[in-house]
């Protein structure tokens, strides 16, 4: 029944295309995928980048892992199967957003290499920018903004990534960020790579990039 139903679904083509939206927006669309441990600084960097892009009239949207878990994926647990489904759903939403001509920032742990590989394949290599926010576990645990590491050490959480659950470090991320350096410098690196890939035009970055 399920397979027969899928045969009756036909993707509808629209006259307003991604290319037309990008031309109107004045920039290309892309997914910037921030991966790293809880407390690594993914959301802070993603938020900083979005703020700069927004201030300069680029169309953006930030998909934060906790926000998605509270809404679209509120029915999912933290089992491996549900973690994979969580990432798949975020990937599908991201795919729609790049078709809308938006620069999509995704801040989510996404601990498994296979997950991230599938998203890259789903979106297409040129549409996916993997950013590894590389912060040592001990620093993440010292920060512990959500008290997750504390709960994990007390046995109140049994599946925290980096403690009981594996985090697979990206082997060849598009950008490797050290979160222990300044937020401004990391944000500037991201602006530079977006310019290098011709996603955006940001003249005189070093002179105008002040915040």
Curated annotation (Swiss-Prot):
InterPro entries associated with the record: APS_kinase (IPR002891), P-loop_NTPase (IPR027417)
Broad class of enzyme this protein falls into: transferase
Active site residues per record: 110 (phosphoserine intermediate)
Metabolic or biological pathway, per its Swiss-Prot or TrEMBL entry: Sulfur metabolism; hydrogen sulfide biosynthesis; sulfite from sulfate: step 2/3
Binding site for ATP: 36-43
Superkingdom of origin organism: Bacteria
Keyword entries, A-Z: ATP-binding, Kinase, Nucleotide-binding, Phosphoprotein, Transferase
Any one biological process term the GO annotation gives: hydrogen sulfide biosynthetic process
Pfam families, A to Z: APS_kinase
GO molecular function terms listed in the Swiss-Prot or TrEMBL record: adenylylsulfate kinase activity; ATP binding
SUPFAM superfamilies linked: P-loop containing nucleoside triphosphate hydrolases
Catalysis performed (reactions): adenosine 5'-phosphosulfate + ATP = 3'-phosphoadenylyl sulfate + ADP + H(+)
UniProt keyword Kinase, yes or no: yes
EC assignment: 2.7.1.25
Task performed by this protein: Catalyzes the synthesis of activated sulfate.
NCBIfam families registered for this protein in UniProt: apsK, PRK03846.1
Similarity comment text for this entry: Belongs to the APS kinase family.
PANTHER family named in the record: ADENYLYL-SULFATE KINASE 1, CHLOROPLASTIC (PTHR11055:SF63), BIFUNCTIONAL 3'-PHOSPHOADENOSINE 5'-PHOSPHOSULFATE SYNTHASE (PTHR11055)
Identification of the protein by name: Adenylyl-sulfate kinase
Record organism: Buchnera aphidicola subsp. Schizaphis graminum (strain Sg)
Gene responsible for this protein: cysC
């Amino acid at each position: 029944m399920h397979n027969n139903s899928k045969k009756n679904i036909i993707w509808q083509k629209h006259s307003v295309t991604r290319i037309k939206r990008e031309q109107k927006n004045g920039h290309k669309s892309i997914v910037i995928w921030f991966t790293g441990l809880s407390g690594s600084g993914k959301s802070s960097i993603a938020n900083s980048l979005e703020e700069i892009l927004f201030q300069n009239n680029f169309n953006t949207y930030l998909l934060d892992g906790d926000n998605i878990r509270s809404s679209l994926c509120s029915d999912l647990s933290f089992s491996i199967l549900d973690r994979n489904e969580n990432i798949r759903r975020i990937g599908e939403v991201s795919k729609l957003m790049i078709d809308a001509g938006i620069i999509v920032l995704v801040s989510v742990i996404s601990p498994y290499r296979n997950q991230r590989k599938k998203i890259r394949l789903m979106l297409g290599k040129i549409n996916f920018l993997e950013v590894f926010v590389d912060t040592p576990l001990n620093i993440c645990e010292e920060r512990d903004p959500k008290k997750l590491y504390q709960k994990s050490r007390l046995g109140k959480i049994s599946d925290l990534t980096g403690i009981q659950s594996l985090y697979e470090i990206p082997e060849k991320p598009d950008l490797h960020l050290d979160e222990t350096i300044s937020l401004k410098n990391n944000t500037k690196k991201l602006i530079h790579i977006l310019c290098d890939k011709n996603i955006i035009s940001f003249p005189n970055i070093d002179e105008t990039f002040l915040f």
